[in-house]
Structures are given as structure tokens and as C-alpha cells.
Amino acid sequence: MTLPGGVILVFILVGLACIAIIATIIYRKWQARQRGLQRF
């Protein structure tokens, strides 16, 4: 069973999009934590 290149490309793009969204959420939480530490 071989998948066409287009399907593989779509899977890669979806995977990268999910990683980017997760990385953005983690980065924002980390930034908020850094700001919280600076206040105290």
C-alpha cells in the first residue's frame, strides 16, 4: 500500500501546524510565568 505524495504532504503540513500551535501555547505560558517571577 503506497500513499500518493499529496496525502503525505498534507499529513506533514498538519503535523507542523499542530507543533506550531502547541509551541506557541507553551511559549505564552512560559512568558507569563517569567513575568510572574519578575514581579515577586
Curated annotation (Swiss-Prot):
Residue ranges crossing the lipid bilayer per the database entry: 3-26
Entry keyword Membrane: yes
Cytoplasmic topology ranges: 27-40
Pfam families associated with the record: PMP1_2 (PF08114)
Keywords associated with the record: Cell membrane, Membrane, Transmembrane, Transmembrane helix
A cellular component annotation (GO) from this entry: plasma membrane
MF annotations from Gene Ontology: enzyme regulator activity
Compartments (UniProt record): Cell membrane
Main subcellular location: membrane
Chain positions listed as propeptide in the UniProt record: 1-2
InterPro entries linked: Pmp1/Pmp2
Subunit structure: Monomer and homodimer. Associated with the 100 kDa subunit of the plasma membrane H(+)-ATPase.
Note: Present with 124000 molecules/cell in log phase SD medium.
Protein name in the entry: Plasma membrane ATPase proteolipid 1
Gene: PMP1
